[in-house]
């Protein structure tokens, strides 16, 4: 039987960033091959650093998918744990080591007997940086294994051990990276009339773009426009010719995201026109679409967990954080949910150290749900 805690600790020591998860993939494949030995209803495929494990059903009517992400973050770990990261500047601060371990535990249980329906376990790379789910889908990695229903989880520090939370609508916002560069004309600070100050134009844009959320977004739906980087100029007595802004757009539906993207671009172009200068606007959403749960499937999952002993189900509000599972759920009906890990530290914190008793709880809960879906 798989030692969940040791497996998690092994994975915790070898975090790798997106599409560089070579040791992680090798470790996972070794475990998967041991678990699947002698199981003639199992097939395994790889895609770059990703892995797909397909359990052929005995009388399949559909394919049920379970997705886990496998990448780490470029963070220096500060937990002081004896099994801390052995990769300098890399850490499983988003707790994907837990996600992988739970998936392996569920795979082990699913292999006890051939399921009626097909089951697909996806070990997906590059959730944090490259939208690996989108890359796999667009590259045809699923082939004829593409699920009819897709499920997945993410751990959450502010939920207690034993709590599961989701809803019947949007769980994560869609995110879009924004880069804007104003191009004016540089000059001496004493002669502003001979220059065209990109810093002033960019500053004007920052104030004007605040109207997008306050005046273009339905307050009930919500959206966020935040610029965290503003770079302009090199010294105090020179008018700069360029100003660079780097920010993010977040919205709970794709329609709202597209509206906000359009308005941000329009405001930037309007400001540039008013100041008689050029502007470049780069909007990059990629695969980070809103994670929109299928209402009927979400209700089914919520009802199932609500009746499970040891599980407290919470109907939770959406989070404005992003998650690339949204892309796959835009192609396949499915559900994502939160699993409580009761940590004082937020996700991506260098001291993140979740409670390991969650592993057994997660495996028991998820495997029982997948068993139900596989038998329908």
UniProtKB/Swiss-Prot annotation:
InterPro entries: AcetylDAP_deacetylase, Amidohydrolase, Bact_exopeptidase_dim_dom, Peptidase_M20, Peptidase_M20_dimer. One of its GO terms (biological process) is diaminopimelate biosynthetic process. Pathway: Amino-acid biosynthesis; L-lysine biosynthesis via DAP pathway; LL-2,6-diaminopimelate from (S)-tetrahydrodipicolinate (acetylase route): step 3/3. One of its GO terms (molecular function) is N-acetyldiaminopimelate deacetylase activity. Pfam families: M20_dimer, Peptidase_M20. The keyword Amino-acid biosynthesis applies. It comes from the Bacteria. The active site is at residues 69, 128. It catalyses: N-acetyl-(2S,6S)-2,6-diaminopimelate + H2O = (2S,6S)-2,6-diaminopimelate + acetate. The keyword Amino-acid biosynthesis applies. Keywords: Amino-acid biosynthesis, Diaminopimelate biosynthesis, Hydrolase, Lysine biosynthesis. Its EC number is 3.5.1.47. SUPFAM superfamilies: Bacterial exopeptidase dimerisation domain (SSF55031), Zn-dependent exopeptidases (SSF53187). Catalyzes the conversion of N-acetyl-diaminopimelate to diaminopimelate and acetate. Belongs to the peptidase M20A family. N-acetyldiaminopimelate deacetylase subfamily. NCBIfam families: amidohydrolases. This is N-acetyldiaminopimelate deacetylase.
């Amino acid at each position: 039987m798989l030692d969940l805690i040791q497996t998690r600790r092994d994975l915790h020591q070898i975090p790798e960033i997106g599409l560089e998860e070579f040791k992680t993939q090798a470790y996972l494949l070794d475990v998967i091959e041991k678990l699947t030995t002698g199981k003639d209803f199992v097939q395994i495929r790889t895609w770059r650093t990703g892995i797909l494990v397909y359990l052929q059903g005995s009388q399949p009517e559909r394919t049920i998918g379970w997705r886990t992400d496998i990448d780490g973050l470029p963070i220096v770990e500060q937990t002081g744990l004896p099994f801390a990261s052995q990769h300098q500047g890399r850490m499983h601060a988003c707790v994907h080591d837990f996600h992988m371990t739970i998936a392996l535990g569920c795979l082990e249980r699913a292999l006890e007997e051939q399921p009626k329906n097909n089951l697909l376990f996806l070990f997906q790379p590059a959730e944090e940086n490259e939208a690996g789910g989108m890359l796999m889908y667009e590259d045809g990695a699923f082939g004829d294994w593409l699920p009819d229903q897709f499920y997945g989880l993410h751990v959450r520090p502010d939920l207690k051990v034993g709590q599961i939370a989701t809803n019947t609508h949007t769980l994560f916002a869609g995110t879009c990276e924004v880069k804007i560069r104003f191009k004016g004309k540089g000059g001496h600070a004493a002669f502003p009339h001979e220059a065209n100050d990109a810093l002033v134009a960019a500053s004007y844009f920052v104030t004007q773009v605040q109207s997008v959320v306050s005046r273009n977004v339905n307050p009930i739906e919500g959206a966020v426009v935040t610029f965290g980087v503003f770079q302009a100029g090199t010294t105090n007595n020179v008018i700069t010719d360029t100003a660079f802004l780097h920010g993010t757009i977040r919205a709970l539906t794709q329609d709202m995201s597209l509206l906000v993207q359009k308005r941000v671009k329009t405001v930037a172009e309007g400001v540039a026109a008013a100041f008689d200068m050029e502007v470049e606007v780069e909007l990059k959403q990629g695969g980070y679409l809103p994670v929109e749960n299928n209402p009927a499937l979400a209700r089914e999952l919520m009802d199932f967990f609500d009746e499970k002993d040891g599980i407290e189900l919470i109907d939770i509000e959406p989070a404005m954080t992003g998650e690339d599972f949204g892309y796959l759920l835009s192609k396949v009906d499915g559900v994502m949910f939160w699993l409580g890990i009761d940590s004082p530290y937020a996700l991506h914190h260098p001291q993140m150290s979740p409670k390991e008793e969650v592993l057994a709880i997660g495996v028991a809960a998820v495997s029982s749900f997948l068993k139900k879906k596989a038998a329908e």
